[in-house]
Curated annotation (Swiss-Prot):
Its EC number is 2.7.7.6. This is DNA-directed RNA polymerase subunit beta. Keywords: DNA-directed RNA polymerase, Nucleotidyltransferase, Transcription, Transferase. The RNAP catalytic core consists of 2 alpha, 1 beta, 1 beta' and 1 omega subunit. When a sigma factor is associated with the core the holoenzyme is formed, which can initiate transcription. It catalyses: RNA(n) + a ribonucleoside 5'-triphosphate = RNA(n+1) + diphosphate. It comes from Xanthomonas euvesicatoria pv. vesicatoria (strain 85-10) (Xanthomonas campestris pv. vesicatoria).
Length: 1383
């Protein structure tokens, strides 16, 4: 039995899950938080830091040596400072939340004269390397005041990949195989076959070269190449006639000989017959070692080596020549005893490299190097050194080429090596053996005779020969996840490399000019690279903050797009499709609809990344059919070897698999296996899906397409005024709310001491109090009415009362869309499935007026409006209430500084901040200037540029912030805001100090009461300290007490030290805060003052708003009907929402029907509990009823609730919280069965069919048949008609065409397009059409004249020349065709 926490005891979900949970839902933001923690390694001592993140980047670039080698800059360590502003201040001020990075570097100068590089002097110094953004506790970054998320990227893993072109390149449809070595950074190396079976290579996708050029550049000769790739047949040449072949029978298979193959007299294969495997076996049995063959058998074979005349040294034939009869004769003449030929055939030993050598124009290593140089740098004259350096820098230097540990691991596994470790550059035995620098010697010593490039070519030729298979690039073993930390490290390294170049230049001057490390290093490139990445990278995204779920999902996104990834246009169907390896790693359901489908994925609930960045998923071990609770994480590569059973495989009480054949997965296929052959078993049924999909109850009954929409639309739900937990959930709601960070969770257990709307104070348990100055008080400040990124309202409200005993992790306050610590995205509505007068045609939704009345779907949106006063060429703009040509009434909401009051209710067009801008159309004469100066007539030379409420918006001002540039005097409003803020901070600190002080005194009291004192105020030696005595003593005099007991004396001293320390700390913190509040603000260049006004807009639900359930059942509100007209039940209760039943069968999302049934039962049970409580039934009766609800199922794994843990008071409290409905959980793929739903309906005294008789609210008549009625959790989505409705009378025009702009943001018009013109033409409405095309659009004079006419009361129009016609004339003239209009 589980024990329940303080929060969980308030309301318990009835869980229908049959599978015992082996693993708790892991921390959902781990992928972000852990990755960045490893990048910073902030809490790790410098000497213990792992080779990761910042540390690795710094180590890889340093030491930097000067060109002469006389000076070097070495890296010692780094540390991060304290952030200047905390998270809240950064959001408010529009700053980035980060900490300064200080790197300790050592400048070493060597003595030039000394031969042994003696050190002349060393200087160590801390250098500032820019700000490093810090991650908030919730996995976000604050960049320029907005919260952003760096999403993870799924990219192709470094390593080597083999593929073919699927027969698309050549018209014959022949498969052309290719290999590609992809490093983490550096040049790509490709190998490919052409249709004629020659092998080519490309570097960085440039033009192709025969592969032998690359091998020759590595130092291989023709003979060595052939020896590496071919087995050799040896022929002994008889002096007069015939040839003896050294026989390897296997090599004859598939050949047809033109002579009898005999062993002595016994003919094994007749001439002209093909040699089969049976013949080969006979030859092996007979032990034939040599075979006499005629000369023509040797002619046409390919030589494996150069043939030289032993006596004269004359070259008779080259390696790779085809032997002809003349050469054979020459061999005989020169007395050549034996020649070697390549063993090739058409079956499985292709002569590919031999073919390639024939088209290779180069003969020496140098020629090959020059050829590569010409291909890489066309047009540059090659020199020997340049060619060698270029080639070496391509693949063999650590600076330019890095396979990375992942790449090396993948490479070695693919070419069949046992060892997964190795160098991060490509290694070749021949190439490095010929070089004689230290690095090459080390490599040769460690890796003797391996050759990366040769092995890749060997594997490729084997695949071409029909042995081996190509790779599947969509397999998750070939794609890895790059998370925040790794991307930040790469960007940081790029910045450092830029610095490195500059430092190298300066290092040569360091010695002569006595420069310090600080003067050598310029931090700007590093800071710029980091800023650019966090501010504008494709993977740094504006956080989706609609509701807690959208935050969590955004942080768990996996993007295939972005730098180094795919592009939308080039991504084909295969990349986007669901792959068998996605199982348990990437959600198979949640992905956006539209052009990004399949490219943006979500991590599965239990997925995590391993040290190489591959996604892995947990499985339970199975041994001999017994399922254990040991969990092992497997990546897609490892999983390939195992047979894995489903999570719902049947087991008995001893955890043995009971079925004769268990449904399993093996290598991406589904099959049945006996229990003894099963290796692993899924951990949980929801293993395959992401968090959003796991929140859809009865997901297993929904069609996948609709489930996708359901998962996606939950992220768009707007937090309502009062959250309501879903009656039918899946049991994962609590985990999502906990990890999203919107709730306030207790850091330590204790007792609630003080509470108000904005703050909770907890007195911590003795056991959890740390040493030192820890006074055992935790203070939680709640977030009140703050704007989210999506303009929804973030507000936290307390859940606890004074005196409540809480434990660590308990929920103290709810945030947006949470209800007692559970995710609550919408409202539970009473729903009927029936048509109603066409108002639910095409998925429309009919609402009851009661829904609007009770504010069930009322949401608060907070809009931020900004007014900026700049310094212009004509003088500064000014924020003031003195605005020309504006009525008094328009200014009555502004104070004397010209800023709107808090609490003012404003509508579209109202002035929020008065601002005037100097206008300088008239040049003043000196006389006028003098008069102006004397009389100060100012109104005429400024224009009104005030901040007004945008069209279509109204609301209440809830906050105003004024930012003033440093050095400019603050106005009255700014000073007032500043004073209020200082007062608030002071009160906050005073309260905190008072609470801490009280806690310290209370602890001290418990330690000294009843102890004997040696003296003190009004105390004699030997007196006992009592409570009454302490009550009468001034607090400060407590420290005068001298105790006999050592411990008590220590306690007094400790308490005094604690109070003094806290007092000092609070004073310092207050001074710091005060300084921050009073200092000027860091504004953009040219900005003098900035005013931000926050408007709270209340939006009720109305026709045109989009709503949805959790099963992809979306629709638009068509009408809001009075309560009395809605269909009602026999009890008189009318329904809230009427949905169209036709929306269900074709969409196949039956989950919504089951949810409605179970929701009705949940509500019915709640009503039954309410009746019990109202009748004041005995607690035992309530306990029995709750036991019936929670523990009715006697299956082995049924989830049970131990009600004996609850005291009577707790049970009554639980009962009260269940009045609104008993919440149920039906986990995905493991949900409630039909029988269980029926049982719940029966318990609630409701019809088991889930249907009831409804009556028409307007006539009172019963409908013809019974209707499905019940409760569904229904959401209001962030597609509100208020944001989309828009109308224009007059507004801005396009500069060139003079036509009205388009779109709501530009206050544009509606386009009267080509088809609409046809419609008017068809009706013959010529005058209407003329009006549309001229005065209502782009006839500039006509429209101005028309305005005048309307003002004058004359209703007539004269259509003139449309401006677009003039544009057309100008465009034709630009083609040198003159066109003129004649009167």
């Amino acid at each position: 039995m589980t024990s329940y926490s303080f929060t969980e005891k308030k309301r318990i979900r009835k869980d229908f899950g049959k599978q015992r949970s082996i693993l708790e839902v892991p921390f959902l933001l781990a992928i972000q938080v852990d990755s960045y923690r490893e990048f910073l390694q902030e809490d790790v001592e410098p000497n213990k830091r792992k080779d990761l993140g910042l540390h690795a980047a710094l180590k890889s670039v340093f030491p930097i040596s000067s060109y002469s080698g006389n000076a070097a800059l070495e890296y010692v360590g780094y540390k991060l400072g304290q952030p200047v502003f905390d998270e809240r201040e950064c959001r408010q001020r529009g700053m980035s939340y980060g900490a300064p990075l200080r790197v300790t570097v050592r400048l070493v100068i060597y003595d030039r004269e000394s031969s042994t590089k003696a050190i002349k002097y060393v200087k160590e110094q801390e250098v500032y390397l820019g700000e490093i953004p810090l991650m908030t506790g919730n996995g976000t970054f604050i960049v320029n005041g907005t919260e952003r998320v760096i999403v993870s990227q799924l990219h192709r893993s470094p390593g080597v990949f083999f593929d073919h072109d699927r027969g698309k390149t050549h018209s014959s449809g022949k498969l052309l195989y290719s290999a590609r070595i992809i490093p983490y950074r550096g040049s790509w190396l490709d190998f490919e076959f052409d249709p004629k079976d020659a092998l080519f290579t490309r570097i960085d996708r440039r033009r192709k070269l025969p592969v032998s050029i690359l091998l020759r550049a590595l130092g291989y000769s023709n003979e060595e190449m052939l020896a590496e790739f071919f087995e050799i047949n040896t022929f002994h040449i008889n002096p007069d006639e015939g040839v003896q072949l050294e026989l390897v029978p296997e090599r004859l298979r598939g050949e047809t000989l033109n002579f009898d193959l005999a062993d002595g007299d016994k003919v094994i294969v007749e001439a002209g017959k093909r040699i089969t495997a049976r013949h080969v076996k006979q030859l092996e049995a007979a032990g034939v070692a040599a075979l006499a063959v005629p000369d023509d058998y040797l002619v046409g074979r390919i030589l494996s080596h150069d043939v030289v005349d032993g006596s004269t040294g004359e070259l008779l034939a080259n390696a790779n020549d085809e032997i002809n009869e003349d050469q054979l004769a020459a061999f005989r003449k020169a007395g050549v005893d034996a020649v070697g030929t390549l063993w090739v055939n058409d079956l499985d030993r292709g002569p590919y490299l031999s073919n390639t050598l024939r088209i290779d124009p180069t003969k020496t290593q140098l020629e090959a190097l020059v050829e590569i140089y010409r291909m890489m740098r066309p047009g540059e004259p090659p020199t020997k050194e340049a060619a060698q350096n270029l080639f070496h820098n391509l693949f063999f230097t650590f600076e330019r080429y890095d396979l990375s540990t992942v790449g090396r691991m993948k490479f070695n596994r693919r070419v069949g090596r046992k060892d997964v470790l190795g160098e991060s550059v490509l290694y070749d035995k021949k190439y490095f053996a010929e070089r004689n620098d230290e690095e090459s010697k080390r490599l040769v010593a460690e890796h003797a005779d391996t050759s990366d490039i040769l092995e890749v070519i060997k594997v490729l030729t084997e695949i071409r020969n029909g042995r081996g298979v190509v790779d599947d690039i969509d397999h998750l073993g070939n794609r890895r996840v790059r998370s925040v930390g790794e991307m930040a490290e790469n960007v940081f390294r790029v910045g450092l490399v830029r610095v490195e170049r500059a430092v190298k230049e300066r290092l040569s001057m360091a010695e002569s000019e006595g420069l310090t490390p600080q003067e050598l290093i310029n931090a700007k490139p590093v800071a710029a690279a980091i800023k650019e990445f966090f501010g504008s990278s494709q993977l740094s995204q504006f956080m989706d903050q609609n509701n807690p779920l959208s935050e969590v999902t955004h942080k768990r996104r996996v993007f295939a797009l972005g730098p180094g990834g795919l592009t939308r246009e080039r991504a084909g169907f295969e990349v986007r499709d669901v792959h068998p390896t996605h199982y348990g790693r990437v959600c198979t359901i949640e992905t956006p609809e539209g052009p990004n489908i399949g490219l943006i994925n979500s991590l599965a609930v239990f997925a995590r990344t391993n040290q190489y960045g591959f996604l892995e998923t947990p499985y339970r071990k199975v041994l001999d059919g017994k399922v254990s609770d040991d969990v092992e994480y497997l990546s897609a590569i490892e999983e390939n070897e195992y047979v894995i059973a489903q999570a719902n495989a049947l087991t008995d009480a001893k955890n043995m698999l009971t079925e004769q054949f268990v449904p399993c997965r093996f290598q991406g296929e589904s099959l049945l296996k006996p229990p003894s052959e099963v290796h692993f078993m899924d951990v949980s049924p929801m293993q395959t899906v992401s968090v959003a999909a796991a929140l859809v109850p009865f997901l297993e009954h929904d069609d996948a397409n609709r489930a996708l929409m359901g998962a996606n639309m939950q992220r768009q739900a707007v937090p309502t005024l009062r959250s309501q937990k879903p009656l039918v959930g899946t049991g994962i709601e609590r985990a999502v709310a906990r990890d999203s960070g919107v709730t306030v969770n207790a850091l330590r257990g204790g007792v609630i001491e003080q509470i108000d709307a904005a703050r909770i104070v907890v007195k911590v348990n003795e056991a959890e109090i740390g040493g030192g100055t820890d006074a055992g008080v935790d203070i939680y400040n709640l977030i009140k009415y703050t704007r989210s990124n999506q303009n929804t309202c973030i507000n936290q409200r307390p859940l606890v009362n004074v005196g409540d005993v809480i434990a660590r992790g308990d929920v103290l306050a709810d945030g947006p869309s949470t209800d007692i610590g559970e995710l609550a995205l919408g409202q539970n509505m009473l729903i009927a499935f029936m048509p109603w007068n066409g108002y639910n045609f095409e998925d429309s939704i009919l609402l009851s007026e009661r829904v609007v009345e009770e504010d069930r779907y009322t949401t608060i949106h907070i809009e931020e409006l900004t007014c900026v006063a700049r310094d212009t060429k004509l003088g500064p703009e000014e924020i003031s209430a003195d605005i020309p040509n504006v009525s008094e009434q328009a200014l009555n909401r502004l104070d004397e500084s010209g800023v709107v009051y808090i609490g003012a209710e404003v509508r579209a067009g109202d002035i929020m901040v008065g601002k005037v801008t100097p206008k300088g159309e008239s040049q003043l004469t000196p006389e006028e200037k003098l008069l102006r100066a004397i009389f100060g007539e100012k109104a005429s030379d400024v224009k009104d540029s005030s901040l007004r409420v945008p069209p279509g918006m109204d609301g209440t001002v809830i906050d105003v912030q004024v930012f003033t540039r440093d050095g400019i005097e603050k106005d009255k409003r700014a000073r007032q805001i500043e004073e209020n803020e200082i007062k608030r901070v002071k009160k906050d600190f005073d309260d905190q100090f008072r609470i801490l002080e009280a806690a310290i005194y209370a602890r001290l009291r418990s330690q000294i009461v009843g102890k004997v004192a040696n003296g003190g105020a009004n105390l004699k030696k030997g007196d006992t300290v009592t409570d009454a005595y302490l009550d009468g003593l001034k607090k400060s005099d407590w420290f005068q007490l001298r105790m006999k007991d050592e411990d008590a004396a220590d306690a007094i001293e400790r308490a005094q030290k604690q109070i003094q320390a806290h007092e000092k700390e609070f004073e310092a913190r207050f001074a710091d805060k005060r300084g921050k509040i009073t200092q000027g603000d860091d504004l953009a260049p040219g900005v003098l003052k900035m005013v931000k006004v926050f408007l709270a807009v209340k939006r009720r639900i109305q026709p045109g708003d989009k709503m949805a359930g959790r099963h992809g059942n979306k629709g638009v509100v068509s009408n809001v009907v009075p309560v009395e007209d809605m269909p009602y039940m026999a009890t008189g209760e009318s329904v809230d929402i009427v949905l169209n039943p036709l929306g269900v069968p074709s969409r196949m999302n039956i989950g919504q029907i089951l949810e409605v049934h179970l929701g009705w039962a949940a509500k019915g049970l709640g009503r039954k509990i309410q009746r019990m409580l109202e009748a004041q039934a005995a607690v035992s009766e309530l306990r029995k009823f709750l036991n019936d609800i929670y523990n009715h199922d006697n299956a082995i794994n049924a989830q049970r609730v131990d009600l004996s843990q609850f005291s009577d008071e707790e049970l009554l409290n639980l009962g009260k919280n269940l009045i609104d409905g008993v919440p149920m959980a039906t986990p995905v793929f493991d949900g409630a069965s039909e029988a269980e739903i029926k049982r719940m309906l029966e318990l609630a005294d409701l019809p088991q069919s889930g249907q009831t008789q409804l009556y028409d609210g307007r006539t009172g008549e019963a409908f013809d048949r019974k209707t499905t009625v019940g409760y569904m959790h229904y959401l209001k989505l962030n597609h509100l008609v208020d944001d989309k409705m828009h109308a224009r009378s007059t507004g801005p025009y396009s500069l060139v065409t003079q036509q009205p702009l388009g779109g709501k943001a530009q206050f544009g018009g509606q386009r009267f397009g080509e088809m609409e013109v046809w419609a008017l033409e068809a009706y013959g409405a010529a005058y209407t059409l003329q009006e549309m095309l001229t005065v209502k659009s782009d006839d500039v004079q006509g429209r101005n004249q028309m305005y005048k006419n309307i003002v004058d009361g004359e209703h007539e129009m004269v259509a003139g020349m449309p401006e677009s016609f003039n544009v057309l004339v100008k465009e034709i003239r630009s083609l040198a065709i003159n066109m003129e209009l004649e009167e």
